[in-house]
Amino acid sequence: MFKPVSPNVNFPEQEEEILAYWKKNKIFEKSIQSRPEDKKWTFLDGPPFITGMPHYGTLLSSIPKDVFPRFWTMKGYRVRRVWGWDCHGLPAENKVEVSLGLKSKREIEKKVGVKKFIAECKRYVSQVSGEWEWYIDHIGRWVDFQNAYKTMDLSYMETVMWVFKQMYDKDYIYKGLRVSLYCPHCATPISNFEVAMDSDNYKEIEDHASTYKYKLAVEKDTYILAWSTTPWNKIVTPALAINPKLTYVKVEQSKEKYILAKPTLKMLQDIPYKIIDEFKGTKLIGKKFEPHYEYYKPNIKEGEKAFIIIGGDFVTAQEGTGVVTIAAYGEEDLSAMKREGIHIEMHLDEEGNIKPQVPKFGGLYYLAANKLVEEDLNDRGLLYREDKLPHSVPLCWRCHTRLYYAPQDAWYVDIQKLKPLLLQTNKKINWFPSHFKFGRFQKSVENAPDWNISRSRYWGSPVPVWECTCGERFVPGSIKELEEASGVKIADLHKPEIDQIEVTCKKCGKKVHRVPEVLDSWIEAGSASFAERHFPFEQQEKLEDFFPPDFIAEYTGQIRAWFYVLHVIGAALYRSPAFKNVLVEGVILGTDGRKMSKNYGNYPDPKELLQKYGGDALRLYLLGSPVMHGQDILISEENYRNQIKGIMLLLWNVYNFFITYARIDLWTPKDGATNISENILDKWILSRLQGLVRNTTESFENYDTVTVVAKLHDYINELSTWYIRRGRDRVGVTADNKVDKESFYTTCHQVLKTICKLSAPIVPFLSESIYRNLTSEESVHLSDWPAENNEVVDKKLEEKMTFTRNIVEGGHSVRKINSIKLRQPLNSIYITIKETSQKLDKEFEKLIQDELNVKQINWEVDKNLDKII
């Protein structure tokens, strides 16, 4: 006998009961153990930062990471689901700096020391928020928290060391001087994709955009006009660049002669001038100019060029004068300087201050020097014009300090060498939505610079390189290899312990220390497929058993971040895609369309809504929304709440009706019973059920939850508003046709069981509650995915039922237009059809008569008819 069901269901209370049942009976563990070890479906979870608090974004990412493992488990696959924590990097360091009252990187070493600072970082990341488990439980996600890996674990860090070694040996890693984004507060390079992840990492400002006069060395009163947005960088200008293909002019204005690109004459002051010469840019190449500041002249080595005009295709006439200043603090600038043999001078220290040896400006923060440089050059008659330019500047993703481009002698992944392979392997990946594949992701790969993977910080995996002054390097790929080379037992790979490990140079015999940098934490994230399993050191599984993983999912910001670094490392190590299928979610914005922020007060508290409406409603809301098609949405409590009114209560009411009358009629399912009903409603709903099985299966396999939710909603609506509505008189004490009653209960029971299975990945709590009462089985999540039964599919019957429902809908509309209430019976209705063959059988006519409360149906044929009347 079924347990009684209340029509007034409290979904959050029900979910608490289900959670307790799952934990007590270890249903999650059984769902894994019940599947064969030799049939695996793998997914890789991007670990959140260990001390961060859950929010709608993390919940959004977590939900599909539960949906698809549930689906593939029911399909018969063993799905490993282990949680992970991201521990290293600036998020922890910045928090510890604040807790210790430190205001700069320099104070870390001077005031507290690296050892204490690292100890504080370890303590900080050990404080795992208990909130995480509450949230993950209450959105219905199954995951192994007990065996969670951490990126700070020795085993994880050893695999990262191995990954570095593999890439280094394949000549994909090099050390060199290149320009990258730099944070003067954190005193470290910042990855360009870290900034690109979030629009809040950019700030709109109005900045300097000045035109400077550089006197040509051998031409009297002749200046070349150069444009720049960085006055602080004018302190060191060892070269100017022009475009050889552009046409330049020499003009005479106010007794001085100026050279600039002809298309930029509008940049001249509003003073009369005349053009006295016109020539191609090639004529300017090699000419010398007088520098504005000469303090670094003694640093210029023999063979190096300085104060010379060079050519560059990167110079355009779109902005400025067609002439740009060249210094080491620009990617194209530095590349041109290396190519032309220009002297490289760096005048900022690691905190963004001008070095003390620089006259007039030494010790100033670089931005503070802007105004003083402009004033000095203006006083000396070298500032032609000063303008303002509104533009967007990047900010540090952790401390929000304004970034600048700076030359870094650092460790890089040679993306240019890898790029053809990266583009090729992307073709093998299934992206959903598909437009990201050759759209945003491919474009990010095509435009990617070499990746700076070293950081001038402390809390992270070490750059595993011991570099001798003679140039020899030792790059271990394992702890064992390092122990053998050093003779020291390794218990911790963190600073400062790792910095005390010495090895002997095989070339010259000197004692060698490790280079001081740590690795970008993104290389740890990109190594997750291997490092979470401590591959290749614990060979419990073959590589092909887990790599590339079948599935990953994150929001659009990870296209240029986690997806990208996974792709780079997968291609570099194995010339393989790093994942087979990727689901890209959109972003959940606040109610006002801005990023969700406590300061804005523009979003409802997720915990409060989970307690109020439950986890299934949140899952339905998000899984059925455009956010699962990579589009951004505004958070809406109303849309969240509407899921209860929609699918959930609709299904519950059908279930409640079935249980109520089954108890009244003392009906119980019979083992092995087959449904051979002749009732057209039973045949129709079972035929439609097979279409639902087919469509949901295909949509799950294509990672399209929006279609799954839509198909479930449509079917449950048909079940409630047509099948149950038209079948109410088939059950209960007044229904005397026992055969028909048995058919109804058997059909309804079969349909509800199947719906529970199909919806289990979407609404795991509701499906579990219903399924456990319908069956004697332990859990719907331990059952097998339903197979489509083509024998009961009847497309002609479905077409006739659709026609029937359309007629009914039209009839209701006519009643409404004419203000005729349904309870008022009508003698007859007239239905005009185009062909006699469209006339429905008596069974369908009976449905129309009962639904529209009419006694007789009259059919009329009109071959010129466009639609049924």
Which ranges hold each PLM region?
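N-terminal, positively charged nucleic-acid-binding surface of large information/translation enzymes
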Residues: 1-255, 326-339, 343-358, 380-422, ...
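Amphipathic alpha-helical
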Residues: 19, 168-198, 271-272, 284, ...
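Active-site-adjacent bridging/hinge elements
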Residues: 37-45, 67, 104-108, 133-140, ...
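Structured ligand/cofactor/substrate-binding pocket environments in proteins
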Residues: 57-69, 76, 85-86, 151, ...
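Short, polar/flexible loop-turn hinges at active-site or ligand-entry regions and domain interfaces
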Residues: 102-119, 431-434, 607, 628-642
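Short hydrophobic alpha-helical segments that form membrane-spanning helices or hydrophobic packing faces
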Residues: 177-179, 236-239, 407-408, 531-533, ...
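Feature 926 captures the class I aminoacyl-tRNA synthetase adenylation module centered on the KMSKS loop
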Residues: 211, 443-523, 527-529, 535, ...
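Short acidic, Pro/Gly- and aromatic-enriched capping/linker segments at domain boundaries
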Residues: 378-399, 499-517
